[in-house]
Amino acid sequence: MESSSNSDQNEGTPTSSVSSPYRRTYSDISGLSHRFDVQSFYNRPSNTNAVVLSGHEEDVSEDAEEPKDDVVNDVHGDGDEEDSDIDSAEDAELEMMRERFAKLLLGEDMSGSGKGVCTAVTVSNSITNLYATVFGQSLRLQPLSTEKKDLWKREMNCFMSICDYIVEVIPRSLGTNVEITETKLRSDILMSLPALRKLDNMLMEILDSFTENEFWYVERGSSSMNSGGGGRDSGTFRKVVVQRKDEKWWLPVPCVPAEGLSEEERKHLRHKRDCASQIHKAALAINDSTLNDMDIPDSYLTTLPKSGKASVGDVIYKQLCTAEKFYPDQLLDILKITSEHEALELADKVEASLVTWRRKTGGLTHSKSSWDMMKDISGDADRGNDKNHILAARARSLLFCLKQRYPELSQTSLDICKIQFNRDVGKAVLESYSRVLEGLAYNVVSWIDDVLYVDRTVRNRDD
């Protein structure tokens, strides 16, 4: 009986030894960057379940041995099935990760002919596609499903693990005449990546907070919407929602009770909106800083006109040149921008003229951080009567105010060109991660605004 138990024990050991490395790796996906210590693995204590059962055999009668043997066999039988299921799941996950990294290395060219894009662009596209997969169908204030949340965390941890190897070498003194060098994460990754992870977790917490809501949604064109009933005490308030000028037809319709939301619910919505708005600003700042650190591609420079005046036009150029004190907000009011398309077109023109004037002043010799660029807004104007310096400073302030006034503005032609020709994998991770978080935060703010708008309209109608 003891020998059979020992044999059961020995049979269970190989199963655990095979599955353990995969389990250790994928319990925390960043474990891909850790080395697996084979010696310490085989020195682990073996499974003690069978030993405990066999240790009592001397104290029981022969009649009791058979039930014990059945129990041992049942325990090992169930354990083998569970281990087999775990191994199958881990093998499938491992195969998926192998395929994912193969696509990254091949540059999305599975033919292997070398026609794929560079690794940085592949990583950027992968993060963008992952965001579309996880959040593309999420059009309302509600928590993510467990499957999508696990997918997002697992895949993003995989992409973040790439940054563990992007380091810079710095000198370190030992207190003697001998100095050594050590490696640490590159400064931009060390500062921005933890901040982005924190913003990501905060956005997930905001979505998770919308579980027991006083509002609900109905799909446009559904029977409940057409009949004016949303499944609760009040209707969908369809007639008021349709009157919104900025209505997005692809979004579901938010509905509130006939008497409106309670004060506690409105307070909760406003608080979450403020949090999401701050997250949006932080992600936008990181994204702008990362884009400003990227070099301007030569292909973009060759498309620029010789003068900045040709880019912005006579009206804007006159305002930039003649005014003693330049007020960008007043210029935006004069232009009377009516759509996002017009705002994006203006941003492209101003950015092109800005690059042209900076080239003439020798300001494109190296990349600048966003903080350095903001200091130049006031610093360039103090360099005397250099016309190009003044025009560049005013164009930069105009572009900054334009992006502040239209936070939903799409990426400019220069930004797209930088991302397309970027070869720095670390910057690609930071830029794409901050961009998708910026988009998610903006969507959350918009969804909350939609609910508050319907609530405000319902209460005003009752008054």
From Swiss-Prot:
Principal location class: cytoplasm
GO biological-process terms attached to the record: defense response to fungus; plant-type cell wall organization; root hair elongation
Tissue expression as described in the entry: Expressed in root vascular tissue and trichoblast cell files. Expressed in root metaxylem cell files. Expressed in guard cells of cotyledons, rosette leaves, sepals, petal, stigmas and siliques. Expressed in root metaxylem cell files.
InterPro entries xref list: PRONE_dom, RopGEF
Ranges annotated as biased composition (Acidic residues): 59-68
GO MF annotations, alphabetized: guanyl-nucleotide exchange factor activity
Pfam families cross-referenced by the UniProt entry: PRONE
Cystines in this chain: none
Residues covered by region (Disordered): 1-25, 55-87
Phenotype upon loss of function: No visible phenotype under normal growth conditions, but mutant plant roots have reduced density of secondary wall pits in metaxylem vessels.
Subcellular location: Cytoplasm; Cell membrane
Keywords linked to the UniProt accession: Cell membrane, Cytoplasm, Guanine-nucleotide releasing factor, Membrane, Stress response
Composition-biased stretches (Basic and acidic residues): 69-78
PRONE domain boundaries: 84-463
Domain of life: Eukaryota
Annotated Gene Ontology cellular component terms: apical plasma membrane; cytoplasm; plasma membrane; secondary cell wall
Self-association and partners: Interacts with ARAC10/ROP11.
Further remark: Plants overexpressing ROPGEF1 or ROPGEF4 are relatively insensitive to ABA-induced stomatal closure and become severely wilted during drought stress. A similar phenotype is observed in plants expressing a constitutively active ARAC10/ROP11.
PANTHER family, alphabetized: ROP GUANINE NUCLEOTIDE EXCHANGE FACTOR 1, ROP GUANINE NUCLEOTIDE EXCHANGE FACTOR 4
Domains as described in the record: The PRONE (plant-specific Rop nucleotide exchanger) domain is responsible for the GEF activity.
Function: Guanine-nucleotide exchange factor (GEF) that acts as an activator of Rop (Rho of plants) GTPases by promoting the exchange of GDP for GTP. In association with ROPGEF1, acts as a specific regulator of ARAC10/ROP11 function in ABA-mediated stomatal closure.
Annotated protein name in UniProt: Rop guanine nucleotide exchange factor 4
Gene (name only): ROPGEF4
